[in-house]
């Protein structure tokens, strides 16, 4: 019998302010990788995380 793939999937969170902000501490885009349960959270995930490029806590959204 084949195994079930499971409900947890790997996602990437990207800083929303890095692309539009020109006054950054360093060039680049902050990204975090994490897991989410697709049954409990079917919509896109949004979390406040620390961005080392902006040097502050910003909103990070899920990307594909």
Curated annotation (Swiss-Prot):
Per its UniProt record, what InterPro entries does this chain match?
Ribosomal_bL33, Ribosomal_bL33_CS, Ribosomal_bL33_sf, Ribosomal_zn-bd
Show the GO MF annotations.
Answer: structural constituent of ribosome
Q: Which residues form a coiled coil?
A: none
Q: What is its main location?
A: plastid
Q: According to the lineage, what is the superkingdom?
A: Eukaryota
Name any one Pfam family assigned in the record. Ribosomal_L33
Q: Which GO cellular component terms, listed alphabetically, does the Swiss-Prot or TrEMBL entry include?
A: chloroplast; ribonucleoprotein complex; ribosome
Q: Identify this protein by name.
A: Large ribosomal subunit protein bL33c
Matches recorded under PROSITE patterns: RIBOSOMAL_L33
Against PANTHER family, the record matches this protein to: 50S RIBOSOMAL PROTEIN L33, CHLOROPLASTIC, LARGE RIBOSOMAL SUBUNIT PROTEIN BL33C
Q: Does the entry feature the keyword Iron, yes or no?
A: no
Instruction: Tell me one GO biological process term.
Output: translation
Q: Where in the cell is it found?
A: Plastid, Chloroplast
Which UniProt keywords are present, listed alphabetically? Chloroplast, Plastid, Ribonucleoprotein, Ribosomal protein
Say which family it is in: Belongs to the bacterial ribosomal protein bL33 family.
